[in-house]
């Protein structure tokens, strides 16, 4: 989502970074470039105007911090204004109410509302260990309730099934009564979406909001909608007590202007962003980290948190102990690492987190290892016998043909896998003897290239 803006801003700021001193002339020239980058990213005009005013005011005639170069000082100002536009801090969910804490999810049909509710339930369950109940008041779309029930089963969260003949108001009342009776901590309510905003829809949600005494009402916004999403958010914000926003489909080719505009226009914080189709692809919105990502400083903290949450640490410790004892790294170990990688989202996930360094990402082939490649690798290893996985050296002609046939791949793919595995095994051996500093030089060839 931020790649294009990152590229444009990087090009603009690069020119001023190495300047010996800042003058009004070179500041204005850079600001013009920054303004153009923000316009292309579809940032709202009112936001751009305020952003540029603040940057100009703080940089022209501003006293330079002695520990920074003039260029670094200017970038620091730009970063501060990016953070200010997006909301300065992360706003967590509010649970400070007598249970159940009711969270409403509202938005247009097709915005990813129902899926986002399930993702949110999964996130709350993992983060806070709360007892959660999910229900749907969308009686207008035949498949809506069934879709949410299926998602609830997937994330192992209880679902309150309503009578299809009941009204959304009746469903809300019954769900709250049941949640209190069964001592649930949180009740997540999915409301009906529409293809466009209408008065009936708003009146219904307003009633649900009042009856449920919702402590959070989260607006789901499709980032692919651009300026239309901002106009839609204004209407929802005027008619409802919106507490925050979840921005969906940020892993696509959407322009990043919506992330920079939404809080400034509505006055409400972006609380989460949807980063993919998987049920775990939801992360809290941290303005400072996003600003770092936009400016090419890389989102290290989000990456670490994701790895800690999604990767099985016991498997890593197990492999480390095994290598320390002198055992060989085999294809069973490799398969375990591939499965861990898939949990995070494949190597393209890392490419997105570090997409700012374009020269680096273009040169490192491992960043092109996508989900399909990981699936192929897994299929090939699963088509091997236990002996072949432990001693891949025995895999010759006829065995390669059998593995390719069993995994639906080509013999060339099996050859590539074995070669890449051999490279990895050599690096694993080096870890024991040379230490990590020398090993790091071989990392770019460590993982399989795209088939």
From Swiss-Prot:
Intracellular or extracellular location(s): Cytoplasm
Catalyzed reaction equations: GTP + H2O = GDP + phosphate + H(+)
One protein family per Pfam: SRP54
Gene Ontology terms: biological process: SRP-dependent cotranslational protein targeting to membrane
Major localisation: cytoplasm
Molecular function in Gene Ontology: 7S RNA binding; ATP hydrolysis activity; GTP binding; GTPase activity
Keywords: Cytoplasm, GTP-binding, Hydrolase, Nucleotide-binding, Ribonucleoprotein, RNA-binding, Signal recognition particle
Entries under SUPFAM superfamilies matching the protein: P-loop containing nucleoside triphosphate hydrolases (SSF52540), Signal peptide-binding domain (SSF47446)
First-tier enzyme category under EC: hydrolase
EC number, UniProt record: 3.6.5.4
A cellular component annotation (GO) from this entry: signal recognition particle
Sites where the protein binds GTP: 107-114, 190-194, 248-251
Function: Involved in targeting and insertion of nascent membrane proteins into the cytoplasmic membrane. Binds to the hydrophobic signal sequence of the ribosome-nascent chain (RNC) as it emerges from the ribosomes. The SRP-RNC complex is then targeted to the cytoplasmic membrane where it interacts with the SRP receptor FtsY. Interaction with FtsY leads to the transfer of the RNC complex to the Sec translocase for insertion into the membrane, the hydrolysis of GTP by both Ffh and FtsY, and the dissociation of the SRP-FtsY complex into the individual components.
Family (UniProt): Belongs to the GTP-binding SRP family. SRP54 subfamily.
Quaternary state and interactors: Part of the signal recognition particle protein translocation system, which is composed of SRP and FtsY. SRP is a ribonucleoprotein composed of Ffh and a 4.5S RNA molecule.
UniProt remark on domains: Composed of three domains: the N-terminal N domain, which is responsible for interactions with the ribosome, the central G domain, which binds GTP, and the C-terminal M domain, which binds the RNA and the signal sequence of the RNC.
PANTHER family: SIGNAL RECOGNITION PARTICLE 54K PROTEIN SRP54, SIGNAL RECOGNITION PARTICLE SUBUNIT SRP54
Designated name of the protein: Signal recognition particle protein
Organism: Buchnera aphidicola subsp. Acyrthosiphon pisum (strain APS) (Acyrthosiphon pisum symbiotic bacterium)
Gene (name only): ffh
């Amino acid at each position: 989502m931020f790649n294009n803006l990152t590229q444009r801003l990087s090009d603009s700021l690069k020119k001023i970074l190495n300047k010996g001193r800042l003058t009004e002339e070179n500041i204005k020239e850079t600001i013009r470039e920054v303004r153009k980058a923000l316009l292309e990213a579809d940032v709202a005009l009112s936001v751009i105007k305020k952003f540029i005013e603040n940057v100009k005011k703080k940089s022209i005639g501003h006293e330079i911090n002695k520990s920074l170069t003039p260029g670094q000082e200017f970038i620091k100002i730009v970063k501060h204004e990016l953070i200010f536009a997006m909301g300065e801090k992360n706003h967590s969910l509010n649970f400070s109410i007598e249970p159940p804490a009711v969270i409403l999810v509202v938005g247009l049909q097709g915005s990813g509302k129902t899926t986002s509710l399930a993702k949110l339930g999964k996130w709350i369950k993992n983060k806070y260990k709360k007892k959660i109940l999910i229900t749907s008041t969308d009686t207008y779309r035949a498949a809506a309730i069934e879709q949410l029930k299926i998602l609830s089963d997937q994330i192992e969260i209880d679902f309150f099934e309503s009578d299809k003949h009941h009204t959304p108001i009746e469903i809300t009342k019954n769900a709250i009564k049941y949640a209190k009776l069964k001592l649930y901590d949180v009740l997540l309510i999915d409301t009906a979406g529409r293809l466009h905003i209408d008065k009936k829809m708003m009146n219904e949600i307003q009633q649900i909001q009042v009856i449920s005494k919702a402590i959070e009402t989260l607006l789901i916004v499709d980032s692919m909608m651009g300026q239309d999403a901002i106009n839609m958010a204004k209407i929802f914000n005027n008619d409802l007590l919106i507490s925050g926003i979840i921005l969906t489909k940020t892993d696509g080719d959407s322009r990043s202007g919506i992330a920079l505009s939404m809080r400034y226009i509505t006055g409400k914080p972006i609380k989460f962003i949807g980063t993919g189709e998987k049920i775990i692809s939801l992360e809290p919105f941290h303005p400072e980290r996003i600003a770092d990502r936009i400016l090419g400083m890389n989102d290290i903290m989000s990456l670490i948190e994701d790895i800690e949450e999604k990767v099985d640490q016991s498997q890593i410790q197990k492999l480390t102990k095994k290598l320390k004892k002198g055992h060989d790294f085999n294809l069973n170990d490799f398969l375990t690492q591939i499965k861990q990688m898939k949990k995070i989202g494949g190597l393209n996930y890392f490419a997105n987190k570090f997409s700012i360094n374009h020269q680096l990402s273009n040169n490192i082939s491992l960043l092109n290892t996508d989900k399909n490649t990981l699936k192929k690798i897994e299929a090939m290893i699963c088509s091997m016998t236990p002996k072949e996985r432990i001693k891949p050296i025995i895999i010759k002609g006829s065995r390669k043909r059998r593995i390719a046939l069993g995994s639906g791949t080509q013999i060339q793919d099996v050859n590539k896998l074995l070669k890449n595995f051999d490279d990895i095994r050599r690096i694993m051996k080096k870890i024991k003897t040379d230490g990590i500093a020398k090993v790091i030089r071989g990392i770019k060839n460590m993982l399989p290239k795209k088939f």
